[in-house]
């Protein structure tokens, strides 16, 4: 989901609450857990955002979810606030914004690394070291295997795409031959 001024504001407030206690990563883990719960049961998400359901019923549902997932008091309060202000629709964007803001605080850069086959630990370490050198931050790799790439690696980091795949090389070569 796309970031909005609303989601960014809530994410920033949550980072400001979590940072002093060193809870940035654990708060993100809980947000991700809640996001997965909503993804597994989309009807629940729609039910919570429904204007026709009584507020006390929604509060009860949120309490049950919070207890089941063992959410922190801060996240329980956030959920209640989002529900009360009818802003649950911004939750996915809030999670993405939170991760981005928390990464800045923690000095991290996230990179999505796609390859045709799984990368061994040495290659992962080399990629991580190069990204750390280039961006001056510790790199967190999110690995994905995409067999259609044929070979090589495509890295998406900080709004840039570094494409060293065989597929893109063949595409460039075809472009040269056709022109």
From Swiss-Prot:
Disulfide bond entries: none
The family database entries (Pfam families) matched by this protein are listed as: OSCP
Q: What's in the keyword line of the UniProt record?
A: ATP synthesis, Cell inner membrane, Cell membrane, CF(1), Hydrogen ion transport, Ion transport, Membrane, Transport
Is Transcription regulation set as a keyword in this record?
no
Compartment list: Cell inner membrane
A GO cellular component annotation here is: proton-transporting ATP synthase complex
Q: How does it sit in the membrane?
A: Peripheral membrane protein
Q: Record's InterPro entries?
A: ATP_synth_OSCP/delta_N_sf, ATPase_OSCP/dsu
Q: Which domain of life is it from?
A: Bacteria
Protein's UniProt keywords contain Ion transport: yes
Tell me the GO molecular function terms: proton-transporting ATP synthase activity, rotational mechanism
Assembly information from the UniProt record: F-type ATPases have 2 components, F(1) - the catalytic core - and F(0) - the membrane proton channel. F(1) has five subunits: alpha(3), beta(3), gamma(1), delta(1), epsilon(1). F(0) has three main subunits: a(1), b(2) and c(10-14). The alpha and beta chains form an alternating ring which encloses part of the gamma chain. F(1) is attached to F(0) by a central stalk formed by the gamma and epsilon chains, while a peripheral stalk is formed by the delta and b chains.
Functional note: F(1)F(0) ATP synthase produces ATP from ADP in the presence of a proton or sodium gradient. F-type ATPases consist of two structural domains, F(1) containing the extramembraneous catalytic core and F(0) containing the membrane proton channel, linked together by a central stalk and a peripheral stalk. During catalysis, ATP synthesis in the catalytic domain of F(1) is coupled via a rotary mechanism of the central stalk subunits to proton translocation. This protein is part of the stalk that links CF(0) to CF(1). It either transmits conformational changes from CF(0) to CF(1) or is implicated in proton conduction.
**Which family does the record claim for this protein?**
Belongs to the ATPase delta chain family.
Output this protein's name. Answer: ATP synthase subunit delta 1
Tell me what organism the protein belongs to. Syntrophotalea carbinolica (strain DSM 2380 / NBRC 103641 / GraBd1)
Q: Which gene encodes it?
A: atpH1
């Amino acid at each position: 989901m796309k970031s909005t001024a609303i989601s960014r504001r809530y994410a920033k407030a949550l980072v400001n609450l979590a940072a002093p206690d060193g809870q940035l990563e654990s708060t993100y883990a809980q947000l991700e857990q809640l996001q997965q719960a909503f993804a597994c049961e989309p009807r629940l998400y729609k039910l919570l955002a429904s204007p026709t359901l009584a507020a006390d019923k929604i509060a009860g549902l949120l309490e049950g979810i919070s207890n089941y997932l063992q959410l922190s008091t801060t996240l329980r309060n956030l959920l209640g606030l989002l529900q009360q202000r009818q802003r649950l629709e911004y939750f996915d964007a809030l999670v993405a914004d939170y991760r981005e803001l928390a990464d800045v605080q923690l000095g991290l850069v996230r990179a999505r690394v796609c390859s045709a086959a799984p990368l061994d630990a040495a290659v992962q370490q080399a990629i991580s070291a190069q990204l750390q050198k280039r961006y001056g931050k510790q790199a967190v790799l999110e690995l994905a295997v995409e067999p259609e790439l044929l070979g090589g690696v495509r890295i998406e980091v900080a709004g840039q795409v570094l494409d060293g795949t065989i597929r893109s090389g063949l595409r460039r070569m075809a472009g040269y031959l056709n022109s």
